[in-house]
UniProtKB/Swiss-Prot annotation:
Name of the protein: tRNA selenocysteine 1-associated protein 1-like
Family matches, as Pfam families: RRM_1, Trnau1ap
Main location: nucleus
Protein task: Involved in the early steps of selenocysteine biosynthesis and tRNA(Sec) charging to the later steps resulting in the cotranslational incorporation of selenocysteine into selenoproteins.
Highest rank taxon of the organism: Eukaryota
InterPro entries: Nucleotide-bd_a/b_plait_sf (IPR012677), RBD_domain_sf (IPR035979), RRM_dom (IPR000504), SECp43_RRM2 (IPR034510), TSAP1 (IPR040434), TSAP1_C (IPR041085)
Provenance organism: Danio rerio (Zebrafish)
Gene3D superfamilies, per the entry: 3.30.70.330
GO cellular component term, pick one: nucleus
Residues of the RRM domain: 6-89, 99-178
SMART domains found in the cross-reference section: RRM
GO biological process, one term: translation
GO MF annotation list: mRNA binding
Keyword Phosphoprotein tagged: no
Amino acid sequence: MFNRMTSLWMGDLDPYMDENFIKQAFSTMGETAFGVKIITHRVTGGSAGYCFVEMADEASVDRCVQRLNGKLVPGSNPPRKFKLNYATYGKRPEPGPEFSVFVGDLTSEVDDYQLHQFFLKKFPSCKGAKVVTDPYGNSRGYGFVKFSDENEQKKALEEFQNASGLGGKPIRISIAVNKGNKASTYHNQNNTYNTNYQQQYYRQPYNSYYPQWGYDQYSGYNYGYNPYAAPPPMMGPPPPMGMPPMPPDMQGSTEAHDGTEEVEEDPSEDPNPQVDVEELNRQYMERSEELYDSLMECHWLPMDTITSDISMMNGS
């Protein structure tokens, strides 16, 4: 009998992924799976595409969710990424205000777990962290950290700027900026923020910043079935028991399993992009030269006065 408090939900399984394969995958990643229960389809008897994995304790569950999510499953062909969640709804993070920061200049070895632990040691309200990855699971060099306490978010902006100890080089940090609100003003240096910006920012759903975090990555699953009952054909497997229903516009969608998984581009961006001044100057000069050449090649002659007759020109 599985203990849900010490178990993981794992999705996006291919038919060949049996208990031994999953145990070996966790072992390769440095974790020990004590048991695997693959959920089967009630009619066909085949895999329903998800399973439950029992770990040693709750700390191991937390670590796996943070450290392995989004990484490639060892030995998977076609390549698959770990899609993990808590096996019990009670482990879902509590609702409430969330305040995020952008963290840049992350070296390739930094993962979600390391990023979270780096901030958690100093700021107890740190609720989680996400390193943004490409479709192959490689780090893009930046991520996001969220807090439940706004004061600790502001302290992190001050105290962790150019901080060392996470990866191979100092990190840079700023308030998280969503592309939809890029025009909103803020002043990071003296921690004064535009009031309208804050009101808009704190109401934004966090799936804009963390498309692979928490339960949103499984939002397409149908919630009307018991987790141990097989879903109907063309439906994805359900999430852990007790998950509340999603809005109508998010129900009925399914995830791709064609081997070339389409990954939605993260809508967040680096708030301090590097500007190539030489390239911008070169483009400006090219546009200026094109305008000059167009004027020089024009065959119209200037008029003496506004009432002058326009002379006819014979083409050469």
